[in-house]
Every structure is written in C-alpha cells, then in structure tokens.
Curated annotation (Swiss-Prot):
It comes from the Bacteria. Its EC number is 4.1.2.40. It comes from Enterobacter sp. (strain 638). It is an enzyme of class 4 (lyase). This is D-tagatose-1,6-bisphosphate aldolase subunit KbaY. Keywords: Lyase, Metal-binding, Zinc.
Length: 292
C-alpha cells in the first residue's frame, strides 16, 4: 500500500454518492485510533494535518508513520496538508512525498486567491498531488488562526464557477454556514446555496467545520454534492474528555499506555459515527488506478 492522492478517492465518492471523512491528526495515537476504525469498517480516509500539526511533529515522522500504517492495515492512505497558506511550504512537503494539499487563500481578494491557487495547482499537478482550495471564508478557530463573524462570508456560486475554471483546482471547500470549532447555537446551513454551487461546479465539494453539525445536516450536504467532510474539534474533545475522566478516577495513574488507550477508544466512537454519516463504510478501493 502507499500514500496516495485524494483526487481518486473523491472522484469515487462523487460517482457513488458518499463522502470521504477527513480526520485531523496530531500524533501516533490519533492516527492509530482513526485507522483502527477505518480498517475495520473498510472506509477510505484522509488524514489531515495543519501547519500546527507539523510544528508539533515533523512531516517526515508523520509520513513515516502513515507509510508504516498503510502497510500494516493493508489500505492506501491520503495524507493531506490542511489549511496551508504558502506555496513554498507546500512545495517542500510535496517534495517529501505528500500527495494532497489544501492551499487556503480565502483571506485574500478573489483575484489574489486565484493567483495563489493557480501557482500551487501548476506545481502540484506536476507531482501527482491533488489540490483543494477554499472560496468564501468560515468563521471560528482553526489551528492558530481565528476568523470572527464579521470576516466570514459565504461562497458565491458564480464566483465558484469562475474560480474553478481559472485555477484548475481538484476540489473546492465551500462556505455555506458551517464554522470551525463548536457552535454556540444550531448552525444555519444554506442548502440552497450549496445546490446552486453544485449546479455550476463539477468537481468534488468539501465541507469544513463539520464538528458539532447535526448528522442529518451533514447527510443532506452529501446528497447535494459534498464529497469530503472535515472533522477535527469533536475528535480532540472526545480524546481529552476521556483522558481527564481517567485521571479523575485514577489520580495516581502515570502509564501512558493506559490513559492514551482510553482517549483513543473515545475518539474511535466519533470516527465510527462520522463514517456512518458519510456513508463511506465498505467503500475502500484497492484498485491499481487508485493506488499510485
């Protein structure tokens, strides 16, 4: 098995009407917890790391872990650069073996976003690396980046059409009412806007900020063309809450093998639910056209 591009995973999801879950990773334990479930449920998966992730643990170390797990779990893995903002940073990581990258220029004006994304697409496509970009801007907290409500804005369908045509990007993250992190009130998802984007854009669409969104809302977005669902905050909360509870019950405890496993098991329950919501169970493809 190997580290692969997300392009083929998302094309299969688009053709068959499901979504591939993209789970944010932080260390060996989070990777292992995710893959234990995905292997058991035979679900394709995208392991996403933000720039902050790669400051915590070097790309080369994460890549080595993912390569080893791909063999031991007998499944191809997509290691994805989530919310990266620099061509130079992406270039270095693609040269190290990564085959999936998100370039986030959503904070720039439209034309500047296009220019940045096009430069990344031109480089990545020469290296069999798929590219995701974002148009519109989600509010909330992602990594060490905070976007307030006044700075967030939704994706315009006609701009999305033009953006995809100008950049040649492989997948598009859209802003339709979700936000990074947890919600203080029930989110208002603009399903009509999503449908209008789907009508004019033929590449896979991506839902960011899916943590804490009602399952029925996520399923509806998949029906309307979302092929990749990002989950981060719910995983961290489940892991951390379980570890805190373990220490409350075992105040003298000090063995990471015990409390890490408790955290991993709690995270696994979230992963199972998200796979069921995405409809990706038993969708793992091992065909040579997918595994590069």
């Amino acid at each position: 098995m190997s580290i692969i591009s997300t392009k083929y995973l998302l094309q299969d999801a688009q053709a068959k009407g499901y979504a591939v879950p993209a789970f944010n990773i932080h260390n060996a334990e989070t990777i292992q917890a995710i893959l234990e479930v995905c292997s058991e449920m035979r679900s394709p998966v995208i392991l996403a790391g933000t720039p902050g992730t790669f400051k915590h643990i070097a790309l080369e170390e994460i890549y080595a872990l993912c390569s080893a797990y791909s063999i031991s779990y007998d499944m191809p893995l997509a290691l994805h650069l989530d919310h990266h903002e620099s061509l130079d940073d992406i270039r270095r990581k693609v040269n190290a073996g990564v085959r999936s990258a998100m370039i986030d220029g959503s904070h720039f004006p439209f034309e500047q976003n296009v220019t940045l994304v096009k430069s990344v697409v031109d480089f990545c496509h020469l290296n069999d690396c798929s590219v995701e970009a974002e148009l519109g801007r989600l509010g909330g907290m992602e990594d060490d980046m905070s976007v307030d409500a006044e700075s967030a804005f939704l994706t315009d369908p006609q701009e999305a059409k033009r953006f995809v045509e100008l950049t040649g990007v492989d997948s598009l993250a859209v802003a339709i009412g979700t936000a990074h992190g947890l919600y203080t009130k029930r989110p208002k998802i603009d399903f009509q806007r999503l449908a209008e984007i789907r009508d004019v854009v033929d590449i896979p669409l991506v839902l960011h900020g899916a943590s804490d969104v009602p399952d029925e809302f996520v399923r509806r977005t998949i029906e309307l063309g979302v092929c990749k669902v990002n989950v981060a905050t719910e995983l961290k909360i489940a892991f951390s809450a379980a570890v805190k509870e373990w220490f409350n019950e075992n105040p003298q405890g000090n063995d990471p093998r015990f409390y890490m496993r408790v955290g991993m098991d709690a995270m696994k329950e979230v992963v199972k639910n998200k796979i069921n919501v995405c409809g990706s169970a038993n969708k793992l493809v091992l065909d040579s056209a997918v595994v590069l």
